[in-house]
């Protein structure tokens, strides 16, 4: 009888401990903007950028992923690269 009581108490404690697991967190965000203008009879992209962020704890550690892209028809390649670097640092 004592073994049965100990087994019941142990089972209740195990069930109680395993039911208090932390919830899985997953958050995703996406943003996109574009501006175009007709210049010299041609439609030009002034800016086109997109940003994606995601946060999750699938591995037990909180992981943040950030991706950004930028493009423009009126800026020089060096200026475009500079803006891309600034977006990826955010």
Curated annotation (Swiss-Prot):
Q: GO biological process: any one?
A: mating behavior
Give the UniProt keywords, A-Z: Behavior, Secreted, Signal
Q: In which tissues is it expressed?
A: Main cells of the accessory glands of males.
Signal peptide position in this chain? 1-21
- Give the InterPro entries listed for this entry: Acp26Ab
The superkingdom of the source organism is Eukaryota
Q: Which is an annotated Pfam family here?
A: Acp26Ab
Disulfides per UniProt = none
Where, subcellularly, is it found? Secreted, Extracellular space
Would you name any one GO CC term?
extracellular region
Function summary:
This protein is transferred from male to female during mating and may affect egglaying and behavior after mating.
- From the Swiss-Prot or TrEMBL record, give the protein name: Accessory gland-specific peptide 26Ab
Q: Which organism is it from?
A: Drosophila simulans (Fruit fly)
């Amino acid at each position: 009888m004592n073994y049965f009581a100990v087994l019941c108490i142990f089972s209740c404690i195990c069930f109680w401990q395993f039911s208090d697991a932390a919830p899985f967190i997953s958050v995703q965000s996406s943003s996109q903007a574009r501006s175009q203008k007709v210049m010299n009879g041609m439609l030009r992209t002034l800016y086109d950028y997109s940003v994606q962020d995601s946060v999750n704890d699938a591995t037990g550690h909180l992981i943040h992923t950030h991706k950004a892209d930028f493009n423009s028809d009126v800026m020089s390649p060096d200026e475009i690269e500079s803006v891309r670097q600034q977006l990826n640092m955010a």
